[in-house]
């Protein structure tokens, strides 16, 4: 039953800017269980499939553009690769430390409050100047650096990347697309690296499919909320969740 609940939690919170890793760690603490980082990573593969389906048209355009040697799409692909490098470096170099943070509900509570503040600020950012094709390489790197911090439970990957993209002047819909596209190699890599630690029980496999389905729901919801300027709702939620974690866990 725990695996199924964690599958729902992962699917819904992976793309909502409220930190899936933080919520997985919180629910693990509520269940009084040892954090299973391997299973958490396995669930990332489920949400990887969900986002791949959600942005399939954009992925096809990029692949097709690269095959035709279209400079515009080659540059976009290069920027996406650049955006993933900081998270890869942090994940490989500080993996043991990151795993230890999953057991610290205090740090998770603090990081959730940071995510909440970023979301409250995001709704005030509305420059709407740049598209995913027009952002400079420096912007791509900055968004990638923000993503690197999201390896910490409580820091939302979608939240930090959306905040960074909007702060740098990207259009809302393009910020959502870029955030989802740059999540593909990170979530896939996280899942593959820890795959050998997964027991592949019936409950875990079912949790995988539940995470996939709820991930699709989360994707549609966050796109609607970002475009509608309602990220502050997630901000208030994260602040309240932070208070709960710090006071009761």
Curated annotation (Swiss-Prot):
Known EC number: 3.6.1.27
Reactions accelerated catalytically: di-trans,octa-cis-undecaprenyl diphosphate + H2O = di-trans,octa-cis-undecaprenyl phosphate + phosphate + H(+)
Any one Pfam family match given in the protein's UniProt record, by short name: BacA
Top EC group: hydrolase
Gene Ontology annotations for the cellular component aspect, listed alphabetically: plasma membrane
Cellular compartment(s): Cell membrane
Topological category with respect to the lipid bilayer: Multi-pass membrane protein
Molecular-function GO terms, alphabetical: undecaprenyl-diphosphatase activity
Sequence intervals crossing the membrane: 11-31, 35-55, 80-100, 101-121, 135-155, 180-200, 202-222, 226-246
Keywords: Cell membrane, Hydrolase, Membrane, Transmembrane, Transmembrane helix
Entry keyword annotation includes Hydrolase: yes
Source species, domain of life: Archaea
Function: Catalyzes the dephosphorylation of undecaprenyl diphosphate (UPP).
The family this protein is said to belong to: Belongs to the UppP family.
HAMAP family in the cross-refs: Undec_diphosphatase
Protein name, entry field: Undecaprenyl-diphosphatase
Lineage of origin: Archaea, Methanobacteriati, Methanobacteriota, Methanomada group, Methanococci
Gene (UniProt): uppP
């Amino acid at each position: 039953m725990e695996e199924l609940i964690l599958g729902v939690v992962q699917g819904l919170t992976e793309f909502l800017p409220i930190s899936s890793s933080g919520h997985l760690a919180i629910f693990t603490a509520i269940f009084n269980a040892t954090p299973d980082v391997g299973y958490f990573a396995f669930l990332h593969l489920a949400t990887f499939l969900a986002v791949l389906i959600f942005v399939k048209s954009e992925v096809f355009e990029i692949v097709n553009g690269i095959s035709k040697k279209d400079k515009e799409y080659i540059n976009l692909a290069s920027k996406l690769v650049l955006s993933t490098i900081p998270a890869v470096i942090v994940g490989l170099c500080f993996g043991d430390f990151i795993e230890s943070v999953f057991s610290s509900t205090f740090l998770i509570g603090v990081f959730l409050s940071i995510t909440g503040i970023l979301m409250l600020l995001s709704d005030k950012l509305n420059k709407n100047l740049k598209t995913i094709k027009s952002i400079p390489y420096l912007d791509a790197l900055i968004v990638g650096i923000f993503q690197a911090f999201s390896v910490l439970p409580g820091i939302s990957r979608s939240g930090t990347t959306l905040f960074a993209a909007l702060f740098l002047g990207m259009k809302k819909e393009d910020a959502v697309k870029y955030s989802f596209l740059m999540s593909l190699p990170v979530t896939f890599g996280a899942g593959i690296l820890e795959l050998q630690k997964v027991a592949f029980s019936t409950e875990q496999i079912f949790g995988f499919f539940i995470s996939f389905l709820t991930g699709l729901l989360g994707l549609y919801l966050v796109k609607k909320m970002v475009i509608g300027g309602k990220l502050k709702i997630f901000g208030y939620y994260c602040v309240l969740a932070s208070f709960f974690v710090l006071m009761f866990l």
